[in-house]
Curated annotation (Swiss-Prot):
Its main location: membrane. The chain crosses the membrane at residues 13-35, 50-69, 76-98, 108-127, 139-161, 171-193, 209-231, 241-260, 273-292, 296-318. It comes from Bordetella bronchiseptica (strain ATCC BAA-588 / NCTC 13252 / RB50). This is UPF0324 membrane protein BB4178. Belongs to the UPF0324 family.
């Protein structure tokens, strides 16, 4: 099924909207899981669960091969400052507003915030096993990435050409890369402006992706501390540190050292996208529409709040940093 999803995501009319195979995968998985689940052999259930949990962690670790220290250095201090500022503020706003203003549970609020703050569906996938969240919570979080990230692809070029973004090429690239949800959506938005902006935006976006590691480590230690104090009321006596985040960091360092043949790295990246697509499809199969309808409007409201922050708050952060 994941192989079919990858082919589907590569169709021109889907690719033009910046939908990654991960996004297409969860949609196809949800359609299958809700309308055709009766046709799935019972013994497939264990494989679906394994893919959505264990295989997911391995795939997130290998995503580190998309990052290098050289990329982070290329954007300089302004790009790094914007990335840190956007990620930290968006996670904080999403977690607090989601729980206190919109009445969402902790996991849904944090998954939605992660999708907006870091790298879209991939961040949701990385947070899900660390939080031990239910699959339907990941699905609704990804829905906000699809909606508002796609909107950015069309909105940003329009407001730039209207003269409402008074940035030079460097600052404009930092703004787009620092505030749009998915990597593909960043490329889609910036490519409608010019190649130089696209290059800067892509590098800044990958800097945000690199921040996934420290964020996951902080999250893991915070959850352990909360469990030890009994603060969240759950039984997490042996809550693990997200070791796949360590793997992500190690592989990013390996990629920075340029010790692997380029053809091998390219092949691993393609395989990793496929495995991430498998994991996202499996999450979709485990998700029920009734679960999404229950929290849907409030999650979308949180997605809108975070999107407004990215557009306007991100503008202010870029102005201060550049």
């Amino acid at each position: 099924m994941a192989a079919a999803v990858v082919q589907l995501a590569d169709l021109p009319f889907i690719r033009q909207f910046g939908f990654s195979p991960l996004v297409v995968g969860i949609v196809c998985g949800m359609l299958y899981g809700n309308f055709l689940r009766g046709t799935m052999p019972a013994d497939w259930g264990a494989g679906v669960h394994f893919t959505a949990r264990r295989l997911l962690r391995i795939a997130v670790a290998f995503y580190g091969l998309n990052i290098s220290i050289q990329q982070i250095a290329a954007v300089g201090l302004p790009g790094l400052a914007v990335s840190v500022g956007v990620v930290a503020s968006t996670l904080l706003i999403g977690t607090v507003a989601g729980q206190r203003l919109l009445g969402l549970d902790r996991d849904t609020a944090m998954l939605t915030a992660a999708g907006s703050a870091i790298c879209g569906a991939a961040a949701v996938l990385a947070f899900e096993p660390t939080l031990r969240a239910a699959p339907h919570k990941s699905a609704v979080a990804v829905a906000t990435v699809v909606l508002f990230g796609t909107l950015s692809m069309f909105l940003y070029p329009v407001i730039y050409h209207a003269g409402w973004l008074p940035f030079d090429t460097q600052a404009l690239g930092i703004y787009i890369g620092g505030t749009v949800h998915e990597v593909a959506q960043v490329v889609g938005a910036a490519s409608n402006i010019d190649p130089a902006t696209t290059e800067v935006a892509t590098i800044v976006k990958m800097t945000r992706v690199a921040l996934l590691v420290p964020v996951l480590l902080v999250l893991g230690f915070w959850l352990r501390a909360s469990a030890a104090a009994g603060a969240d009321g759950k039984s997490h006596a042996k809550l693990p540190v997200p070791w796949f985040a360590i793997g992500f960091l190690v592989l990013a360092i390996v990629n920075s050292l340029d010790i692997l043949p380029s053809d091998l790295v390219t092949a691993i990246r393609k395989l990793d996208v496929f495995v991430l697509t498998m994991a996202m499809t499996a999450l979709g199969i485990e998700t029920r529409f009734a679960q999404i309808r229950k929290a849907g409007p409030r999650v979308m409201a949180l997605g809108l709040v975070l999107y407004a922050w990215l557009v306007f708050g991100g503008y202010g952060i870029v102005k201060l940093a550049t």
